[in-house]
Amino acid sequence: SIGRTIAATMYSNDIDVIFHASGPTGNGVFSEAKDLVSIEPDRDLWVIGVDLDQSAEGEVDIDGETRNINLTSTLKNTGNAIHSFSNTMMEEGFEPGIQWFNLANDGVGIAEGRLTDESLEVIEDYKQQIIDGDIEVPDAPE
């Protein structure tokens, strides 16, 4: 697959982490990383999943032990959007227009994955700064 080919090239050029954000093509990225760590168990290779927690996709058995090469996954919490929309429909009726889902209303996030507690604390701090408006994230390319 194209994902596997691209990942092989990146990993052969000493890239350790790939955030695939490529839909089904990402399966090839996971496959390549798992194959490489099966051959070289001491090598630290990671894949960052997209849209949902892809931890299950990152599992690989090495010498009878399960290892996971999924570092984390970015999450589109579409269930929260559907729940919010449904509640609004029932309580207020349908109102056309754009609705934004973001960190403040749990519309997006990340899976804990294999992130350290220290990393998660830093991420939570930045998340709160974004929610509070101390850090501005553009909603369109600049």
Describe every region a protein language model picked out.
Residues S1-E142:
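A residue-level marker of the well-folded mature domains of exported/periplasmic proteins
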